[in-house]
Amino acid sequence: MTEHIQDENKLIAERRAKLEHVRKNCPANGHPNTFRRKHKAAELQAQFGDKTKEELEALGFQTAIAGRVMAKRGPFLVLQDVSGRIQAYADKGVQADLKDRYAGLDIGDIIGVEGTLHLSGKGDLYVNMERYELLTKALRPLPEKFHGLTDQETRYRQRYVDLIVNEDSREAFKMRSKVVAAIRNFMIKKEFMEVETPMMHVIPGGASARPFVTHHNALDIEMYLRIAPELYLKRLVVGGFERVFEINRNFRNEGLSPRHNPEFTMMEFYMAYADYKDLIDLTEEMLSSIAKELLGDTKLPYGEHVIDFGGPYTRMSMLEAIKHYNPDNATIQAMTYEEVKNIDFMRKLAKDVGIETETFWSCGQLLEEIFGETAEPKLMQPTFITGYPADISPLARRSDGNDFITDRFEFFIGGREVANGFSELNDAEDQDNRFKAQVEAKDAGDDEAMFYDADFITALEHGLPPTAGQGIGIDRLVMLFTNTHTIRDVILFPAMRPQA
């Protein structure tokens, strides 16, 4: 390790010396900003890739390209820009001039090249270096592995290097951008209005999670980074905007895992005069449409599985799912909602399936934990799980036929939750009581229980029409579309512990 650091320091020193040479011999202190590119690599490949050598010679096509030097192969330089790669040819005269002006070029340097487009003997396009300019001298060498970094932590800490050398990473983040754009376009076509709501809240709400706390100096009050935009978006529906959506960050002061990052992106939307079943239909249509648009198919590989977004998706209640994935457990097979309402029964059952419980957990929390332990990891294909207990769904409307559960679902793919939606609770008095129950739970030790939000109750008292709302985790959805299995691979700069 020490030898590697010494070698790297030697290379950096050599490059700094070259930069000093450039500063003395070139304008703009060695960092010019007048070169203008005419074409990207992919544009030239698409337009001229099928031409013969003779056809290109006859065309005499002049171009200007710019990019990072990724390899040197004899007289050829491999340049990389955002679209791909193309070669530049330096004859002996050019090579001598490069050495004289720049003390030679290194891997990682960024250059601009003007010249005629040609075809090499191996059938590769290249630009003859007739005019050229060093635009940025790279002072640090790229990793020795041409096809990417081997150390995962370095990839996350130095994403800029990862993006330079790892094509898979570049493609993953291009796909992320396409997924977000496709979702936005889908929602706009469905007549939803995109809005922006506060990122700092006086009262955190909209989800059960531990918030980040900050201090507003001018107001001299504690504020919270938002854990969800839900309560503000529903205020907008009260105000008359019947279809709204927001794509933005949420912050939850919780642990790191392959599926959790404290800062993550959600698309949350609300539609008046709809219920949770309408959300399910809309979600199926959205994901099927996006898969076809971006991948050309509704089926995509994910690890050892093939995820089918074609629909219709599986739908079952939480209780049904627990029974389905525990066929040999006689107690579970005989369980009804009457048993689920019995706290002693649920604690014993949770213990029997290997769950360490908290004393303040309710019957609904215990049911959800049993589901998460025994059923959730097995939900590989798109599946809507309905029938969430009211005591863990403080913002959802109670089901008409069973007031223990709500008109809520969570959507699972690949063994993890991707979305959460429900028919909204628009009964101001019921919401008031549920907020009070959440305060009691927080006092009993549940750090993730919600706060009481008096202004939101006031908003509901003005009248929220029948409404359904849903949040979709963008990061987890992108994991599926890019066949990656850790959330850090689809977040450009994931949370990391500072280096010593």
UniProtKB/Swiss-Prot annotation:
What Gene3D superfamilies does the entry give?
A: Bira Bifunctional Protein, Domain 2 (3.30.930.10), Nucleic acid-binding proteins (2.40.50.140)
Q: Which cofactor does it need?
A: Mg(2+)
* Pfam families named among the record's database cross-references: tRNA-synt_2, tRNA_anti-codon
Q: Is NADP one of the keywords UniProt gives this record?
A: no
GO BP annotations listed:
lysyl-tRNA aminoacylation
Can you name one GO molecular function term for this protein? Answer: magnesium ion binding
Recorded superkingdom: Bacteria
Q: How is the cofactor bound?
A: Binds 3 Mg(2+) ions per subunit.
Family matches, as InterPro entries: Aa-tRNA-synt_II, aa-tRNA-synth_II, aa-tRNA-synth_II/BPL/LPL, Lys-tRNA-ligase_II, Lys-tRNA-ligase_II_N, Lys-tRNA-synth_II_C, NA-bd_OB-fold, NA-bd_OB_tRNA
Q: List the disulfide bonds.
A: none
Say which enzyme class the record assigns. Answer: ligase
> Any transmembrane segments, and where?
none
The UniProt entry, under HAMAP family, shows:
Lys_tRNA_synth_class2 (MF_00252)
Family of the protein in this entry: Belongs to the class-II aminoacyl-tRNA synthetase family.
UniProt name for this protein = Lysine--tRNA ligase
